[in-house]
UniProtKB/Swiss-Prot annotation:
Protein name in the entry: Aspartate 1-decarboxylase
Mitochondrion listed as a keyword: no
A GO molecular-function annotation: aspartate 1-decarboxylase activity
Entry-annotated residues carrying Pyruvic acid (Ser): 25
Gene Ontology CC: one annotated term: cytosol
Binding sites annotated in the UniProt record for substrate: 57, 73-75
Family membership: Belongs to the PanD family.
UniProt cofactor(s): pyruvate
One Pfam family linked to the record: Asp_decarbox
Keywords recorded for this protein, A-Z: Autocatalytic cleavage, Cytoplasm, Decarboxylase, Lyase, Pantothenate biosynthesis, Pyruvate, Schiff base, Zymogen
C-alpha cells in the first residue's frame, strides 16, 4: 500500500507579494524552504487562512533571509499581501515507511519570523 503523507509545512506565513503577471509559482525564502524540506520546483498546496481558498502551485526560491512569500501568476487572485498561509508539500511512501515518518514543520509569527521548527503537528485536544 502507498500512502500520501505530509512532508513539510510552513504554518502561518504572511504573503509579502502577489504578482499576477509573474510566471506562476510561489517564491519562498530559501531558509523557509530548507526549514520545511521543500525543494525548488516541488509541487505545493497552499491554504489561505484569511479567505479559505485552497490552491496548488510549485515552489521557487526567493532570496535567502528575505522573508519573502510571493504568490505569483493566476494564484495571485487567491491571496493578498498580508494574508496568512499554510504551505504544504506531500510525499508518497510505503505503509511501513509512513508509520515511521515525521514531517518537517516551521511555525511563523509576525512578519515571517520563524518561531520554531518541529517534527510533528501537535495533537489537538478538547
Amino acid at each position: 500500500m502507498i500512502r500520501t503523507m505530509l512532508q513539510g509545512k510552513l504554518h502561518r506565513v504572511k504573503v509579502t507579494q502577489a504578482d499576477l503577471h509573474y510566471e506562476g509559482s510561489c517564491a519562498i525564502d530559501q531558509d523557509f524552504l530548507e526549514a520545511a524540506g521543500i525543494l525548488e520546483y516541488e509541487a505545493i498546496d497552499i491554504y489561505n487562512v484569511d479567505n479559505g481558498q485552497r490552491f496548488s502551485t510549485y515552489a521557487i526560491a526567493a532570496e535567502r533571509g528575505s522573508r519573502i512569500i510571493s504568490v505569483n501568476g493566476a494564484a495571485a487572485r487567491c491571496a493578498c499581501v498580508g494574508d496568512k498561509l499554510i504551505i504544504c508539500s506531500y510525499v508518497q511512501m510505503s505503509d511501513a515507511d509512513a508509520r515511521q515518518h515525521r514531517p518537517k514543520v516551521g511555525y511563523f509569527e509576525g512578519d515571517n519570523h520563524l518561531q520554531r521548527k518541529a517534527k510533528a503537528v501537535p495533537v489537538q485536544v478538547a
